[in-house]
From Swiss-Prot:
Keywords: Chaperone, Cytoplasm, DNA replication, Metal-binding, Repeat, Stress response, Zinc, Zinc-finger. The J domain is necessary and sufficient to stimulate DnaK ATPase activity. Zinc center 1 plays an important role in the autonomous, DnaK-independent chaperone activity of DnaJ. Zinc center 2 is essential for interaction with DnaK and for DnaJ activity. The keyword Phosphoprotein does not apply. It is found in: Cytoplasm. SMART domains: DnaJ (SM00271). The lineage of its organism: Bacteria, Bacillati, Bacillota, Bacilli, Bacillales. This is Chaperone protein DnaJ. Its cofactor is Zn(2+). CXXCXGXG motif repeats lie at residues 148-155, 165-172, 191-198, 205-212. GO terms for biological process: chaperone cofactor-dependent protein refolding; DNA replication; protein refolding; response to heat. Its main location: cytoplasm.
Length: 378
């Protein structure tokens, strides 16, 4: 009986993307999986779907299939010798798999029954400036796979047992014939039904359908380290996805997003504060109160202080998240020029300019001043 076109088997077009092929395979394999579908012919249908996906999901195999069809290339390489061809296109394993089939060597396959650690997960956590600076405790809710509560992660319906896999007869592998440069070769692949374990369920768990896991919202308490900065992360061991075959759970990585402060600017462990002072304070000097992370302190402004002058308060910054002391607090001075002053203040400023030997060409600051000078004939 002639094989059906692989694209037809999966119900996709020949221009289908990898994602479209994967989506079609998942839908069909779930529909015809022998553990779920007990109808006559479902077993053969599942084999056909698995075979089609194995070829179309691999770029080299797919290109070979598109060019030569099911039978592979005929007549070798058309007299071109090896010609630098990519031999991985013939069966997907290249020379290594070919000679493995003859001599029993080649790559060592990972034991499918060996314990495997679960996948690591990542969660982005937004915290305030104060929570990051001083540390805090917060509870988060994430959606993740956990061991099925019905079968306790076994995947089988409670009260039932595992049986020898009907697809591979308990070997955990199936034989696959491949067209290679050395002719038609039989190789072994991991069984797609039992994933190499050699066993399948008498009856899959009705809750998780044999997966052994279910997706749930889980609440987790997170300790925000004192001094944590934007984009830094912490690892919560064992809070990731469940392991397989008795393997440990994966880890959960918390990545922090720190909201900016309305008062300070942060650069690592250092913080910056912009302080506005008047012309009089800058000229004569003063003592002013400035905020820090832990209350206010008095700062001495020397006479003659200029805009952009910077004062440094040692160890008044943020505690280093790794425990390497504290950063500094930098005070940036901004001398503010008044926009509204009285006539008396103007008179004093003119007098100051005269004493200093300055000749001013005063300019009106608004329409009212312009009108006043116009009617005075100035």
């Amino acid at each position: 009986m002639a094989k059906r076109d692989y694209y037809e088997v999966l119900g996709v077009s020949k221009s289908a993307s990898k994602d479209e092929i994967k989506k079609a395979y998942r839908k069909l394999s779930k529909q015809y999986h022998p553990d779920i579908n007990k109808e006559e012919g479902a077993d053969e249908k599942f084999k056909e779907i698995s075979e089609a996906y194995e070829v179309l999901s691999d770029e080299n195999k797919r290109a070979n299939y598109d060019q030569f069809g099911h039978d592979g290339p005929q007549g070798g390489f058309g007299g071109q010798g090896f010609g630098g061809q990519d031999f991985s296109g013939f069966g997907g394993g290249g020379f290594e798999d070919i000679f493995s089939s003859f001599f029993g060597g080649g790559r060592q396959q990972r034991d499918p029954n060996a314990p495997r650690k679960g996948d690591d997960l990542q969660y982005t956590m937004t915290v305030t400036f104060d929570e990051a600076v001083f540390g805090s405790e917060k509870e988060i809710s994430i959606r993740k796979d956990v061991a099925c509560h019905t079968c306790d992660g076994e995947g089988a319906k409670p009260g039932t047992k595992k049986k020898t896999c009907h697809y591979c007869n308990g070997s955990g592998h199936v034989s696959v014939e491949q067209n290679t440069i050395l002719g038609r070769v039989r190789t072994e692949k991991v069984c797609p039904v039992c994933s190499g374990s050699g066993q399948e369920f008498e009856e899959p768990c009705p809750t998780c359908h044999g997966k052994g896991t279910e997706n749930k919202n889980v609440k987790i308490s997170v300790t925000i380290p004192e001094g944590v900065d934007n984009e830094q992360q912490i690892r919560l061991a064992g809070e990731g996805a469940p392991g397989e075959n008795g393997g440990p759970q994966g880890d959960l990585y918390i990545v922090f997003r720190v909201k900016p402060s309305e008062k300070f600017e942060r650069d690592g462990d250092d913080i910056y504060y912009s302080l506005d002072i008047s012309i009089a304070q800058a000229t004569l000097g003063d003592e002013v109160k400035v905020p820090t992370l832990k209350g206010s302190v008095m700062l001495t402004i020397p006479a003659g202080t200029q805009t952009e002058k910077q004062f440094r308060l040692k160890e008044k910054g943020i505690k280093n998240v790794h425990g390497y002391g504290y950063g500094d607090l930098f005070i940036n001075i901004n001398v503010v020029t008044p926009t509204k002053i009285s006539d008396r203040q103007k008179e004093l400023l003119r007098e100051f300019a005269e004493i200093d030997g300055e000749e001013l060409s005063e300019q009106p600051s608004n329409f009212r001043d312009k009108a006043k000078r116009f009617f005075k004939g100035e």
